[in-house]
Design a protein with these regions (language model features):
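Generic beta-sheet signal
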Residues: 1-5, 26, 89-93, 119
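Glycine-rich phosphate-binding P-loop
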Residues: 4-19
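Fold-independent oxyanion-binding glycine-rich loops
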Residues: 7-9, 30-32, 54-55, 94-96, ...
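N-terminal phosphate/diphosphate-binding loop that engages ATP/GTP or pyrophosphate donors
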Residues: 16-74, 78, 82-89
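Conserved catalytic-core segment of NTP-binding enzymes
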Residues: 20-22, 96-174, 178-179
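A short acidic, often aromatic-flanked loop/helix-cap motif at beta-alpha or helix-coil junctions
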Residues: 57-60, 182-188
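Switch II (G3) loop of P-loop NTPases
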Residues: 80-104
Length: 192
């Protein structure tokens, strides 16, 4: 099974959700890493998964922009999909930023389309998440892709009223599969 993990934005907890979906029998693929972070190392440390980062660009910008500023070609959705298609077993593919962030000649949504893979949307807990999440899920469905559901990637230790209400309201957009405590990656089971 292949699952693409995308988000409503950057910094929403995609890497922690990816780690929560992985174990030592899973392969994790970071399509493109930008800036100094090492999401694959985080996933490997938290889950024991085999990890691959397909492209790394120096500046924390969109993959396409960071690659251009570095004077190199950006990895494309076709290159990402070709790599993933050679892998066996459960594969978790994490994008960069949100669903429609550019990877050369396309987006992580195009990767999901090429692979025929469903997506999980990682969202924030607080105020503003309903609109961002609805737009992301609508874009997924508009492309004829499957959204398995939503995970709140960084549930606060002391949630405010907006976060508590959003947890219920997000269910009207897509199933809420879970909420991860800030900075943690407890195992997350996805219904088959």
């Amino acid at each position: 099974m292949r699952i693409v993990v995308t988000g409503t934005d950057t910094g929403v907890g995609k890497t922690y959700v990816s780690a929560a979906l992985c174990d030592e029998r899973t392969t994790y693929v970071k399509a493109a890493q930008t800036g100094d972070d090492d999401d694959a190392a985080t996933v490997r440390e938290l889950s024991g998964a085999t990890t691959h980062t397909l492209a790394h660009y120096p500046e924390p910008l969109s993959p396409e922009r960071s690659a251009a500023r570095a004077g190199v070609a950006c990895i494309t959705p076709r290159e990402i999909a070709d790599f993933v298609e050679r892998l066996d077993g459960r594969v978790i593919i994490e994008g960069a930023g949100g669903l429609l962030v550019n990877f050369g000649a396309g987006t992580i949504a195009d990767v999901a389309q090429l692979l025929g893979a469903p997506l999980i949307v990682v969202a924030r807990a607080g105020l503003g998440t309903l609109n961002h999440t609805a737009l992301t899920v609508e874009a997924i469905r508009h492309r004829g892709l499957e959204c398995l559901g939503i995970v709140i990637g960084s549930w606060p230790a002391d949630p405010d009223l907006a976060a508590l209400c959003n947890l219920d309201d997000l269910q009207s957009i897509a199933p809420v599969l879970g909420k991860l405590p800030e900075g943690q990656a407890p195992k997350l089971e996805i219904p088959a």
